[in-house]
Amino acid sequence: MCGIIAVLRRPSDRKVPTAERITAPLVGAVDLLARVEPDLLGEAADLLGEADRLLGGVPGLLALDRDPTLVGRINEVLAPVPAHLASLEAAVAGSPDVEAANAALVRVRDVLWAVSRDRLDTFAGVTSLRQDRPVPSDAGLAVLLSAQQALSALDRLEVRGRDSAGLQVTVWNHGIDQHDPEVVARSADPLHRSGSVRVLDGGGLAFVVKASAEIGELGDNTAVLRSALVADGLLARALAAPAVQGSLLGHTRWASVGLISEPNAHPVDSTRADGELVPLVTVVQNGDVDNHADLAASEGLSLAPEITTDAKVVPALCAAHLAAGRERLEAFRRTVNAFEGSVAIGMATGDAPDRLLLSLRGSGQGLFVGLAEDTFVVASEPYGVVELTADYLRMDGETPADPDDPGASRGQIVELDAAIAGSVDGITRRSYDGRNLPVTTADLSRAEVTTRDIDRGDHPHFLIKEIGES
């Protein structure tokens, strides 16, 4: 059991909302709740939803960042709400249509949670990640928003495994010379341990932070990742560039193949042990590549002995296909077709930092592509995407595209394009045998859970929470 997360974002063209624009629907909603009339709950939920929408994405983040009083104003407006909700509980119990009134009350609670926890807490998380020397640009804050959202999802996905974790922050248009002494020094680690940097074909930089511990609590690993990001002065320099863009690829691991160590923590990259230069590929993987040892031998993959995870063969083999001149998507397709086992993969390549490749085959894993404002968020469970969006595409690793050829056509491959992030137009989907599988809005599902449902609060484990609530 492991967890995959990825965030791919395009620059937003929505205007940054004013404080008044954000607080007005909140004030209206609180006024309606104060009337303690169940029939008004739906209208109040709509107003709260409008405020949540305005606070979402990069424009909402920038609104909070530019007005240091806004968080306090929002909290002040919402302060009377708990008392109103307590009164409404009794009113709902006496409503002629208790079921409908209770559903509206649940919706109000869900959206209030989204505003206070998902939006305001996300802003606090971004603030904790930033450095003020140098100050991040607005574009840099957008990258930090993606990082915060990825870390938040990893916190939730840790229940699928937590002996190690890793996060790759890939940036381009950053203005840093690839021959900068710190870049050169940090790109020399062949084991891709925490703090490593990889230089992309177009001059972009991929920063990786990792944590590894056999014993620990939920949240320990992401705390280590956060601290490493905050301490990274080179990353801070990149995020100060006015036009910087970035993508995130992360993983939390339960080791099934390979030791618990930083070199084995994902993402793993395509660096060869013999020093031969190959195209840059980085990968996160759930499940096991059962024939990884056979592939390493038959394909002549040069793997460092310190890296014993089966996932290492994925970028190594894909890099070999790229080096042979194959196009990116075809190289990926050939790579994943070589594997035996139930496997989910997220892959980034050095020639296209604005693209993300995904594959899923078998019944034991899952991948969900969330479509949020200007953003794709990918997770191995729906609860990894719901902080950003309720709408997602579920990849199907079992149904054959051609029932007459199930062996070859079972499994799906997806390519995401940051230039059209958040839209089905930015999703290219194919079967394992290369058949085009167009994606429309009819293919999307809607999550039935919210972040309020899956929050474990102050409980160290979900089991303890469930026992306490039973």
Language-model segments: residues:
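Conserved short alpha-helical segments that host acidic/polar catalytic motifs at enzyme active sites
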Residues: 1-469
